[in-house]
């Protein structure tokens, strides 16, 4: 029996590394009856963490997609189908989070009640804002020392700039944490310890909490009143709102991203997770609540597809995974229409047809074969050849390209070589497969040294790639020292003439161009403008000039690093009836760009990372001194229950081995996170040293 679309919820559970997200997901699977034994992360048995490295490191790397059903704590709803995408919280895997947010309709963000809003949480929050994903918050670990629910609520307001609406208050905290108060029903909920919180009872609110509950309930009513004029009138006249009115208003305000409902509990102690599941159903959108999906047709015109079974089929591939039993799995989100196994689909980004063999629905690590996938659902297809992350699959007669995801360029590179010569080919295959799964990871061969270079988003990212090569493909590799991905750019505008002329018996070569080369704002990238008028250079040679410039940009002008953020205008030149060719113009363009760029004040850019260190106060001086030595610029400091938080921008080149140094300087008590921030000009002495090395 197919579930109607309004009973679907596609959600992600997102959080900072240790906020307890995987445990929360485990409880969800347990209470919805999908798994019979609770898998604890610290036993290395969590159902969602199915790669061996994840179980060893206790962090989630691949987002597995799982389907479960829920009909409410009091069985008050029809059975809803919830598709959960488990997202990693580690910054080196931010790309996975971004990718899963793209295909979700809503998210549950888990915060640790002790640590509060951590740097990663801010990143996840920003990405959810970018994709307009409605969310609810679960403040977890209320049973831990130092748990403070209301502090987390105020951080959501201040650090994340959102409007939290508290729907529950905790009864007690730390080891005194007993249950939660439902502020809409105005009842306390207590879960039974014997059956891991499977059953619960409503009891009266403890007398000492009544006043606080009244105060927070008033905030809910105030927020709900914003929803409609009728409610506003009721509110101003001091009338009571019904439970249904409050929930309808909050649902609308959550889906339009005006408020964020906040729940609390302890997943580990089996308290509060079912109430969050009710929140998913009551406040997060179904596929029909979200705006139509936008895309472009083959002519580049904008088109819309409704979430409906009657529309032509369209879907977005958001993850490729290699499965030891069935080979390549392509996870995709269907936005419109119906796809049956055996159908042929069109990959509109690559312009290729693919036949769909088997379709699978995933439950963390077990799989069920299905006959069809309908709009709004998430499934995996087996054995698609040409599909990569971000591709659109659609009906070949009704072509649509849903938006491409933008993936950041890698900031760190290392050389790898197999430990034995015999593994050379195996290593190539392994790296190719891993690169297909992960668009933020790149592989290439250095033409000069012949070495294989892998690039990624951070040291941990590349460590895990090397580790997976060993486990999944049986290839052991030696890893070189990390190299920084520098860039070059220009600081001055210049006009330059470039001529490539060869006259030797027979046909010669002739290409002649004038280029205006100018810097762009950081991050704008490369732009080529054809300003040729009157056919002084024939149309067919112009793409060759562009190509020549781009090839030269890839090879750099001062130190061999790619040139970024320049605008080049081709405004004049000449050609020869017989001797001109695409090749001649490509070489002319390339030489002209190099000569011009050398006069346009070229500079070296280095990647700058945003670093956030949390340290006990006693080590504050050492941490600050060390960041200064690493050419760091401190951006700000604040107090937190875990100690002082220092935010700084530090060049990536200075951050290698930082975790070891920080550990020894603070006896292992400080922690840090780091993510790419921007490219900035390297100081002259540093730039000179790098140029010399080249």
Curated annotation (Swiss-Prot):
Its main location: cytoplasm. SUPFAM superfamilies: EF-G C-terminal domain-like (SSF54980), P-loop containing nucleoside triphosphate hydrolases (SSF52540), Ribosomal protein S5 domain 2-like (SSF54211), Translation proteins (SSF50447). Keywords: Cytoplasm, Elongation factor, GTP-binding, Nucleotide-binding, Protein biosynthesis. Residues 6-288 form the tr-type G domain. GO terms for molecular function: GTP binding; GTPase activity; guanosine tetraphosphate binding; translation elongation factor activity. GO terms for biological process: ribosome disassembly. Belongs to the TRAFAC class translation factor GTPase superfamily. Classic translation factor GTPase family. EF-G/EF-2 subfamily. NCBIfam families: EF-G (TIGR00484), PRK12740.1-3 (NF009379), PRK12740.1-5 (NF009381), small_GTP (TIGR00231). This is Elongation factor G. The lineage of its organism: Bacteria, Pseudomonadati, Pseudomonadota, Gammaproteobacteria, Legionellales. The gene is fusA.
